[in-house]
Amino acid sequence: MQNCDPIKQKIKSLVKQLNKANYQYYNLSDPDLSDQQYDALIKELINLENHYPQFKLPYSPTLKIGGFVEKKFSTIKHKTPMMSLANVFNIEELKAFYDRIVKKIPTFSLLTELKIDGVAISLKYQKGILVRALTRGNGIWGEDVTKNAQTIKTIPLRLNEDLDLEVRGEIYLSHPDFEKLNAQRKQENKPLFSNPRNAASGTLRQLNSAVVAKRNLSIFVYGIADPYLTKPTQKETLVFLTALGFATNPHHYFVSNFENLLSVIEKYKSIKEQLTYDTDGIVIKINELVFHSLIGATAKAPRWATAYKFATITSQSIIQNIIFQVGRTGVITPVCEIMPVMVDGSLVSKVFLHNYDYICKKDIRIKDHVIVHKAGSVIPEILEVIKSKRTDLQKPTLMIEKCPSCKTILEKQPGGIDYFCLNPNCREQKIQKLIHFVSKNAMDINVLGEQTIITFFDKNLITKPSDLYLLKNHQHILQEISGFGAKKITNILDAIEASKQKGFEDVLFALGIKHIGKKVSQVLAKYFQTIENLQQSTSDTITQIREIGIKIAQSIQQYFSNSCNLEEVTKLKKLGVSFQSTNSQKPTTQNIFTNKKIVLTGTLQKYSRLQIQQILEQMGAIITNSLSLKTNYLIVGINAGSKLTKAQKLQIPIIEEKELQQIIENNQIKS
């Protein structure tokens, strides 16, 4: 007879591990397992329980729908349980799901929707007015977060019809808002959120609704909990929800057969990287709601729907070294050098580690085996340290005491998490400031690469930005440098001269004032018009601008109170650099874009998104991100997305790049 005791212990161990993971994920917003790890473990537990039902525990996570509920908010029972979805991870499992339906219902259709990687929520309306918002909680009981939900801009407080209904949706944080939130937290020396989902979860469970209001959460609503209010199909339900005033995700497709479903999956994979929010799969539902009750549900999930999960692209590597770099503001950033490895289509050899606290939290060590992925499909990140492969070779990483460049003792602000080199003459800081000044989003002097900057710096030709505009006086020295012929020198000097015509917002960003990113520099330039106006402004005046906070205002004041900075700005002005705003100037002549609302989609061949935006604004256009009946034109490039389809339905005029170029040339706009 088989000894079942090891199996019983394995089930018990899995239940304990998964219950802990559920609590970490749902209650603390700090998961200790990746999605793929969790999915693999829950699948293993289900398999064991199916084969050995006598060992199934009464508190098994396979019987639950979510996590536990904390007592910070009042808990209320859901009118209809908030069920989660079963997952499939490959085409074979998806085909098995499809075939099970075919056995019961020979003729049916499917509707596919994006699986938003966020926080599930239930919204209750009485006579069209929002009266309650509950988190999923444990699926039966949820936390009352009504006050927080009322601050979310995409949640209507009143519907377009006076209905009593309950809807379900997913709260999420877009990539731009996530980056903005983490940038703000870094300025405030607070721990960074690891991903948008954790940020959305942590935000929704804030006790102070004012904090929630500032973080710009969004929602996509996908269903109605009241059976008597649903429409005949899921597709019609989404149309109905949109008509009521809810935000619904536009990426849903009608599917008539399995072959059609496979082609739709490929379509989703192609658009995934273009999205401004996280998604980890596709929700596939029987479109005809009348069949839902016929197919039924398990104790945990409906049988009429499933989630096809996208594979997380990861790679394993080994940490070869951890070095510390000093940036242009003096902040010290640890960088992990790993054995080069392909991750999601590109070779990765370096991974930034944010700060020393981040290293300690993840216990990252030299010679560790690690799993690397791309956060937001863009930035390489250490997803996990494989501690089971550790030997005596891996020792805890220690923080350096001195600047890696100038050897000045590092300082850490009280209560802060970053270390700084405060030496104004630090070589590396000066070089990084010059590299920033000539960068694409600043003065855009693209012929001056990093190595050229270092060469000129070491020759004592440039130590500050104004020196760039004096290089023309040192051509005899430039000619003596190996690799710098007459043509190359001419190209460099011409590019430097041309940069004098850059707008105030570009020059302001190029100055490298602490906390002044590209977007903030545009806002400030538009408001103050000139460097003199900004220089003479008070903190109170600056903070009157909606997008600007006290940290930025203080940073501006500190910058202009420094005599060296004032001297540098004065010198740049005397050398011909423009500190006059061009962004807010009215077009000299009327054109078809004057005062027109324009939306951009796809990739243009001649212009970057920022360049074409600046050109259109110079022509008097108003650039918006979302299409509506108020949109005057849609400009399309290569790989235009769903906006093109929507514009065609709304009969919005569409302008392609060739026609756009002709309009720009006819109006003699410099590109």
Curated annotation (Swiss-Prot):
Q: Where is the signal peptide?
A: none
Report domain BRCT positions: 588-671
Q: Which Pfam families does this one have?
A: BRCT, DNA_ligase_aden, DNA_ligase_OB, DNA_ligase_ZBD, HHH_2
Instruction: Return the SUPFAM superfamilies for the record.
Output: BRCT domain, DNA ligase/mRNA capping enzyme, catalytic domain, Nucleic acid-binding proteins, RuvA domain 2-like
What does this protein need as cofactor? Mg(2+); Mn(2+)
- UniProt-listed Gene3D superfamilies: 5' to 3' exonuclease, C-terminal subdomain, BRCT domain, DNA ligase/mRNA capping enzyme, Helix hairpin bin, Nucleic acid-binding proteins
Name of the protein in question: DNA ligase
Tell me what organism the protein belongs to. Aster yellows witches'-broom phytoplasma (strain AYWB)
